[in-house]
UniProtKB/Swiss-Prot annotation:
Protein name in the entry: Large ribosomal subunit protein eL30
Regions annotated as coiled coil: none
Entry keyword Transferase: no
Superkingdom, taxonomy of origin: Eukaryota
Organism of origin: Tetrahymena thermophila (strain SB210)
GO CC annotations on file: ribonucleoprotein complex; ribosome
Family: Belongs to the eukaryotic ribosomal protein eL30 family.
């Protein structure tokens, strides 16, 4: 049975990752995590600039890291992470208690 991944489901899993796991927020730290090989999953918001999006997709494909295109703006991605600022990209380093890596 395939579980349907909804936006609310992703947001609750992101909140659990932020509480129990490790994640980096922001473009520079996401690129650094991809280059180091510590990133397991990368989230990119809808309104991320095209140049940055293509660069992250390029490095993630070289490192064979999964990418999830978040359905929402950078404000919504930051809010889903429990932060009060905008976040266009994020990388999950350790999922913690969340099963977000299994649903991708």
């Amino acid at each position: 049975m395939v579980k349907k991944v909804t936006q609310d489901n992703i947001q609750s899993k992101l909140a659990l990752v932020m509480r129990s796991g490790k994640a980096t927020l922001g473009y520079k730290s996401t690129i650094k995590a991809i280059r180091n090989g510590t990133a397991k999953l990368v989230f990119i918001s809808n309104n991320c600039p095209t140049v940055r999006k293509s660069e992250i997709e390029y490095y993630a494909s070289l490192a064979q890291i999964s990418i999830h295109h978040f359905v929402g703006s950078n404000v919504e991605l930051g809010t889903a992470c429990g932060k009060y600022h905008r976040c266009s990209t994020m990388a999950i380093l350790d999922a913690g208690d969340s099963d977000i890596l299994k649903t991708e």
